[in-house]
Amino acid sequence: MDQTLSDFGTVFVFLLLGIIFVVGGYLTARLLRPSRPNPEKLAIYECGEEAVGSAWVKFNIRFYVVALIFIIFDVEVVFLFPWATVFKQLGEFALIEALVFAGILVIGLVYAWVKGDLDWVRPTPNIPKMPVLEEDESQVVS
């Protein structure tokens, strides 16, 4: 029990010192730097060029899907690294668990692939045009 509290105490002290350094650096910079705002300093900076248009641009949804898939597999790697370090001590059951975990993610990847979310340039659907039938006036019920 004492060892656990000691470990948590170490983490707490580390976290507290990190917060103190960040806040201290921010406050020191804020107090020491000169503050002389002018329109040129407050303008949007785009690689030294004048800003053209609005900065609020709609991005294609494909960027979002690719980012989500990247994050999912990035988190998978985060979960598999600790497992890989103690692989020999865990035995076959842990291997089966890791394979099931990776298999579920591969099924999700295949689903996204089949759905077409990984295709950057999507083909336009080819919808056949139906012929227009002319109505026979003799069959129209009045």
From Swiss-Prot:
The listed locations are:
Cell inner membrane
Key word Cell inner membrane present: yes
Chief subcellular location: membrane
Drop me one GO molecular function for this one.
Answer: quinone binding
Q: What is its EC number?
A: 7.1.1.-
- Enumerate the InterPro entries for this protein: NAD(P)H_OxRDtase_bac/plastid, NADH_UbQ/plastoQ_OxRdtase_su3, NDAH_ubi_oxred_su3_sf
Its transmembrane ranges are: 8-28, 63-83, 93-113
For this UniProt entry, what's an example GO CC term? plasma membrane
For this UniProt record, the keywords arranged alphabetically read as follows:
Cell inner membrane, Cell membrane, Membrane, NAD, Quinone, Translocase, Transmembrane, Transmembrane helix, Transport
Q: Has keyword Ligase?
A: no
Task: Give the membrane topology, semicolon-separated if more than one.
Answer: Multi-pass membrane protein
Instruction: Name the Pfam families on file.
Output: Oxidored_q4
Q: Which reaction does it catalyse?
A: a quinone + NADH + 5 H(+)(in) = a quinol + NAD(+) + 4 H(+)(out)
Hey, which family's this protein in? Belongs to the complex I subunit 3 family.
**Subunit and interaction comment:** NDH-1 is composed of 14 different subunits. Subunits NuoA, H, J, K, L, M, N constitute the membrane sector of the complex.
Q: What does this protein do?
A: NDH-1 shuttles electrons from NADH, via FMN and iron-sulfur (Fe-S) centers, to quinones in the respiratory chain. The immediate electron acceptor for the enzyme in this species is believed to be a menaquinone. Couples the redox reaction to proton translocation (for every two electrons transferred, four hydrogen ions are translocated across the cytoplasmic membrane), and thus conserves the redox energy in a proton gradient.
Name by which UniProt lists this protein: NADH-quinone oxidoreductase subunit A
